[in-house]
Amino acid sequence: MSEVKIDSNSFHKRLSLIQKNLTSIQDKQSCLLLLVGASDDENTYKKTTVLQTWLLGYEFVHTGIYITQDKCVFITSEGKAKYLTNLTSKPTENSSSVEIWPRYKDAEKNKETFKKLIEELKKMSSREKPIGHIAKDQYRGKFIDEWNEVSADAGLSFSDCALLLSESMEIKDSEEFANTKIASKSSTVLMDAFANEMMVVVDEEKKTSNSDLSEKIEDKIDSNKWYTKSATGKKLLQSMKEFDPSLVDWCYSPIIQSGGEYDLKPSAQSTTKALVGDGVILASLGLRYKSYCSNVARTFFIDPTPAMETNYDFLLKLQNHVTSTLLRDGTVASQVYQGALDFIKSEKPDLVQHFTKNCGWLMGIEFRDSTFVLNSKNERKLQNGQIISLTLGFSNLTNDKASNPKLKQYSLILTDTFKVSESEPILLTTYPKARSETSFYFKDDEPTAVKSENGGDKKLKSEKNIKTEKNLAANEANSKILKSKLRHESSAADDSNNTEKIRQEIQSKLHEKRQHEGLARFSKADATDASDFKPVFKKYESYVRESQIPSNVRDLKIHVDYKNQTIILPICGRPVPFHINSFKNGSQNEEGDFTYLRLNFNSPGAGGNVSRRAELPYEDSPENSFLRSVTLRSRDHQRMVDVYKAIQDLKKDAVKREQEKKQMADVVSQANLVELKGSRVKKLDQVFIRPQPDTKKIGGVLQIHENGLRYQSSIRMDQKVDILFSNIKHLFFQSCKDELIVIIHCHLKNPIMIGKKKTHDVQFYREASDMAFDETGGRKRRYRYGDEDELQQEQEERRRKALLDKEFKAFAELISDSSSGMVDLDIPFRELGFSGVPFRSSVLCMPTRDCLIQLIDPPYLVVTLEEIEIAHLERVQFGLKNFDLVFVFKDFNKSVVHINTIPMELLEDVKSWLTDVDIPISEGQMNLNWATIMKTVQSDPYQFFADGGWSFLTGEGDSEEEDEEDEESEFEVSDPDPSDEDVESEAGSEDDYSSDASGSDASGGESEEEEEGEDWDEMERKAAREDKRLGAS
């Protein structure tokens, strides 16, 4: 028990529920005494042990718990007591006090402890108010023997408190419900595994007993191979990121029955008789996760008769009636059973005598709560939050058309796990129950039609299945079982509707959760408007004092001072400096013998949408005067060309520096790597890094040190890359199966510099094959004599890939282990992947436990699932072959992520995956303008959620976008504020200088002058207005 950690808050919360119920019945029981002896493997559901697990999360053998209305006392060994010490501190003032009375190896000291307990019990109890205990629970062991010896003559009075404990534990909190949900999912997957195994046995006519098949299913959860190799095992392991295989156990051994002998009691067992592949096969199984139970049972048919099918259809109808009208908050348990019985009497009275004696029970840590069974005697009410195993069945039915006398008798069962709610209950075990999913046909005759209850003809097999049957009959190698197992095929409309209904219910809750989270995260104070916009004014200064001006300006020519980033212009016989940040753009043209150079400068309101610019060159003020443009002319054409080019180059360099400064703003300098020495350093040789520090592709060594990783080039010792564990956000290993490289990938919290590149992703890889080209001829052919088909070469490549995977995965796990829990290894699930276009080309995007990734082709895609606010599906409409996926992040300042052109046939798979990882989904027929949407959300997030939040995404696109019905995605990003395009094009921008110098020369000067500068008449009019204004003042 070295890793035992007891949740103190959960313990005190649950203890208070017991004490509250104890207070309400204080006229019956005064206190509780619950003693546990040695562990009993034959009966794991003793209520006293269940109570320990519920309160503490663990079973404490040889331990007693004494509970009164205001305190709780533990009597246990000194070794176990140390795990309980944190319970003695009260989390709140109203919490009960907790005392720990240790037991010793000395029996005499223990007697003194028990005598002290007996004195407490005598004070609290009397014959009218006895001590509560669980009468059915009988334990053995030294602890129990010592207690019995001391208490035998004490004259204590006891009564059963099973009902009190049941009422305390019946309502499941969010943590308990999450565990039950995982257990139910596990049972559903294992039922699918059973169906696959059973189909193979029946189809291939193997001789297997019911008990042998039960053991085979039971052993699966203990097999690592099953989790990693089989489709069902992978499905269970990958569908839930919080799933831990070590916490899964069986509630009971799977019950498999066939051959005419059936028992619908929960205590039934699989017989040792052979599995009979005819008539009816019953399968019941239940898994528990973190001790919380689930239950599911199904009836499988092999060539059923019409009467059998009719009875089963009625069983489905009965379950639907019970769940839709009876199984809800406030209903008395006996009314559930009586309502089911009344429905049978009204619809099929001949089945009343075959109906089970109860129709389910309350479940939790205890598989079957005997104090809450859905029968005719139980007067307790269903409550919101209870977990119910609803079991409906008919036993001892007769099949008159059975050719085998042993198969004349059959039974039907249908069990599912539900959570009670105020409306219809929530189905947790979603294994298909439709007859088309559980019936298999072996006979070659064409399916006949039978009359359904409403009088219409009802075919036993759908047209799709009939066509499939004809195709299978033509191919003797194919299985005779007609149930389709293809990924994208739905063989039963009713089951598909049920699955869609479940997904919609889950999505509805996820959307509601996001809405509540949004209202909780933001307030009215988070709203921003235009008045909150505070532009940053660039601070620059060419020269502090006049003496710093270069001496060569005395010639009164135009000079460019590269050192001080300044243009010096001769104005009125004096050199006037202009910092390069004040320069906006310019133009040059020739007229006659003169060359004109026009320079435009930044000034407030000189064009462009100011609200879109984070930095401005000047602050507008009535005390400031601004020079908007100046024109100079010279007869020296070459001089003017050189000056203009020098000014342009200086501007480009200035803009480039500003951009680099902004890009480096989030680069955080890492702490120093603590190096290990000698053999303590774990290494992975012959790996390459992306991005490369140098232009040449050079291999190196990846090393694990005390607090991080170091990549060291094998040629240049000064070329190394350090990555600290504390800066690794995600660590991935990607196999080279079906790929050309094997990868260990680090996605970082803060970017680092590799060479001159800033990067959030660092990747270490090795090529899986050294075959650069196919040598089908030449000298090497003689070395492959006899292997012209390259079979041996392919086998060798597969072997090499397997070794690479093993080596890299082991090293990745070593990285995770060395990080002391800071880094957790994540592996992509290729079978859940889907193709799409996140950037420029179509790639395979693969989910992992925590992310959605694409690591093969740069730029890499790493989307953290926990950071996603909502996923929106665009262009989802009939007739299109593709759709788009948009991720909106909880941080609304982050840009949305688009994955375009996903094949439409993967739509359901993408929806299922997003639902499984608890991401709300919306969909629409059009592409949305996300820049405008996010600007609206950022401006007032509280009002956005107050107005309904993301609910608007479930509607169709705006009318202005309805003309976008192209099948292909839009890859061009539209301007979020198109109204200022004309102003921008006329006024120009500093962004013009961010391109290469080769793309801008003097040839475009004339057109620039026409677009950028104002004509002389306009300037004179403005000057006159300004003079008039100043004169009037």
UniProtKB/Swiss-Prot annotation:
Q: Is Transcription among the key words of this record?
A: yes
**Name this protein carries in UniProt:** FACT complex subunit SPT16
User: Bias regions of kind Basic and acidic residues — which residues?
Assistant: 1019-1033
Q: Which GO terms describe its molecular function?
A: histone binding; histone chaperone activity; nucleosome binding
- Extract the ranges annotated as region (Disordered): 953-1033
Report biased composition (Low complexity) as residue ranges: 995-1005
Q: Which SMART domains match?
A: FACT-Spt16_Nlob (SM01285), Rtt106 (SM01287), SPT16 (SM01286)
- Subcellular localization, as worded in the UniProt entry: Nucleus; Chromosome
Supply the InterPro entries for this chain.
Creatin/AminoP/Spt16_N (IPR029149), Creatinase/aminopeptidase-like (IPR036005), FACT-SPT16_Nlobe (IPR029148), Fact-SPT16_PH (IPR056595), FACT_SPT16_C (IPR048969), FACT_SPT16_M (IPR013953), Pept_M24 (IPR000994), PH-like_dom_sf (IPR011993)
Q: Which Pfam families match?
A: FACT-Spt16_Nlob, Peptidase_M24, PH_SPT16, Rttp106-like_middle, SPT16, SPT16_C
Here the segments flagged for biased composition (Acidic residues) are 957-994, 1006-1018
Coiled-coil segments: 103-128, 467-517
Asked whether the UniProt record includes GTP-binding among its keywords, one would answer no
Q: Name one GO cellular component term.
A: FACT complex
| Keywords, alphabetical | Chromosome, Coiled coil, DNA damage, DNA repair, DNA replication, Nucleus, Transcription, Transcription regulation
Its subunit composition reads: Forms a stable heterodimer with POB3. The SPT16-POB3 dimer weakly associates with multiple molecules of NHP6 to form the FACT complex.
Taking the first listed entry, what is the main subcellular location of this protein, grouped into a coarse class?
Answer: nucleus
Q: Which family does it belong to?
A: Belongs to the peptidase M24 family. SPT16 subfamily.
Protein's GO biological process:
constitutive heterochromatin formation; DNA repair; DNA-templated DNA replication; nucleosome assembly; positive regulation of RNA polymerase II transcription preinitiation complex assembly; regulation of sister chromatid cohesion; transcription elongation by RNA polymerase II
- What is the stated purpose of this protein? Component of the FACT complex, a general chromatin factor that acts to reorganize nucleosomes. The FACT complex is involved in multiple processes that require DNA as a template such as mRNA elongation, DNA replication and DNA repair. During transcription elongation the FACT complex acts as a histone chaperone that both destabilizes and restores nucleosomal structure.
